[in-house]
Amino acid sequence: MTTMERRPDSRGKVRDIYDAGENLLMVATDRISAFDFILPDEIPFKGEVLNRISAFWFDKFADIVPNHLVSIDPADFPEEFAEYRDYLAGRAMLVKKAQTIPIECIVRGYLTGSGKKTYDENGTVCGIQLPEGLTEASKLPEPLFTPSTKAEIGDHDENISFERCCEIVGEDIATQIRDLSLKIYKAAAEYAATRGIIIADTKFEFGVIDGKVTLIDECLTPDSSRFWPAASYEEGKIQPSYDKQFVRNWLKANWDMTGETPHLPAEVIDGTSERYREAFQIITGTQFTSMKENA
């Protein structure tokens, strides 16, 4: 079966969520979003890459923070999903239910994107004062924790201060998610450097399971992170990347962010799919072969 006939119990920009009793089945589709818009085209293999990279990082950092992953093996999924195993292979994970902490935990190691824009305006990133003289792709003196609110689909996330984060979730939880975000980012950046990758920035989400702050959703994927090839890194320039920046760049050049979201040209779809698969191979050190072919 090449799709799910069963309607999801909830739907995000990229993931479909199904109730599975004491757990959830989280399915990473091939949908792609940019600038908080869901685009009309799908990117081949994207969902599987996201799902399997997340599983890789969850396993790698299990000693730093607990996570919600139960299994990505369709044989472990509840029987009610058995008829969909071919479709789910590689792109779905069974996860523990969590009480979501309503904060996007963004860590920035380099100056780019919206951070560069606000730095150019007032010398700060999310209210944090930075040294003078930084430029596009400058490495920051220390990684920054820059939280934002979690917006509903169609709305935009709002950058907030750490103090505002404390007001929303309480100082204890805010401190835990800040410290964990920075710890995971630093460990991931150190590992990625051995693979020839710079993690410019990334986003984590956390929940509470059995009273413990737990890493949930996705982890260090091309959707939630900017991955730059270290070999071609050059401060002061826009960096090539193994993520959806290719799509963002095309949209910036060809769409004014009003009206219907445009279809992507075939070369952007194919190029993005290739970048995602390349990211998987470089990060995990294994050749990408779709699990669907072996389901």
What are these regions (language model features)?
Residues 219-279:
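C-terminal helix-cap and adjacent tail motif
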Residues 107, 199-219:
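Conserved metal-phosphate-binding beta-hairpin within the catalytic cores
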Residues 48, 52, 172, 176-179, ...:
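Generic recognition of stable, solvent-exposed alpha-helical segments in well-folded globular domains
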Residues 169-200:
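A long amphipathic alpha-helix within ATP-dependent nucleotide-binding catalytic cores
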Residues 23, 100-102, 196-199, 210-214:
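Coil-to-beta-strand transition motifs
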Residues 1-151, 257-263, 267-295:
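Active-site loop/lid in soluble adenylation, ligation, and acyl-transfer enzymes
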Residues 29, 88, 214-222:
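Catalytic cores of nucleic-acid ligases and guanylyltransferases
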Residues 139-171:
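A short mid-domain helix/strand-loop element embedded in enzyme catalytic domains
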